[in-house]
Every structure is written in C-alpha cells, then in structure tokens.
Amino acid sequence: MFQTLAYYATVFHRSFTAYTSRHLQALGLNFGSLFPVIYVGKHPGCTQAQLTAALGLDWGYSQRTVTRLVEEGFLTREKSGRAYHLDLSPKGQQAFQVSHQVFFDWDEAALTPLDQKEREQLFALLAKVSGKEADSTCTKPFAAP
C-alpha cells in the first residue's frame, strides 16, 4: 500500500479547520483570523509589518484581515511614528484564549487512540521531518500572565 504524508496532512488540516471554525464561529471569527489573533496575543504591540512577515501573508490579505479585526473590535491599531502597533482588545483577549486553547483541545480529540509514549514518538518524528523544534512555544499550552 502506497501512503503519502501529504494525504494525512490534508486529512488533519480539514479536520482541524472544521473543528476550529465551529469554535471560532461562536465568537464571530473565521479560520483566516485564527493566526493573526494568536500572533498579536503572543506579540502585543507588534506592527502590521511584523505580523505579515511572521505569518508569511500577502500584504493585501494582511491589510484586509487586520482592518476587519479592528472594525469588529478584536484588535486595536495605534499609530506610533510611521507604524501602526497592534494589540488585542478585551474582545480580542477572549478570542485569543479560545483560539489558543482550540489547538490543544483538537489535539486531545485527534490523538485519543494513542497512549502518551506514542504521542511523544509522533511529535518527535514530526519535529524531525519538519525541521522544527519539538519543544517550541507552539507545542506548549499558553500560560496567561
């Protein structure tokens, strides 16, 4: 039987997108807003250019997304010199908590068939093939200040 990583990546992506969309919809967010909200939550006061570069976004898409998030009350955008600095509003803080937690909740549901040792093996192998650290901030729950 021929298997590809791309197939499983697609299966997991679709499952994660559907799961996340259901949870974000209650807050008035869509899947496309997930990563900008998380980035600003982890990097308060960042500029839009920093957000755009860090997430690898197209400038136009980033502009539309940030404008929408500001208009809907999730982000604040304050001009400082020639740059705009982004922060989460109280509504954005709530969205950040839900958005961040959804990663761990989905993992728990998706990884139910695996025991702890198998989970550790899976993450070690994924870290190896992705070239990412197995102990990055994305793999640990967010501790609110």
Predicted regions and their residues:
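Residue-level recognition of specific faces of alpha-helices
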Residues: 8, 33-39, 68, 102
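Conserved amphipathic alpha-helical interaction elements at protein-protein interfaces in regulatory
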Residues: 26, 42, 98, 128, ...
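N-terminal helix-turn-helix DNA-binding core of bacterial DNA-binding proteins
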Residues: 14, 18-61, 73
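N-terminal positioning helix adjacent to the helix-turn-helix/winged-helix DNA-binding module
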Residues: 5, 32-33, 47, 84, ...
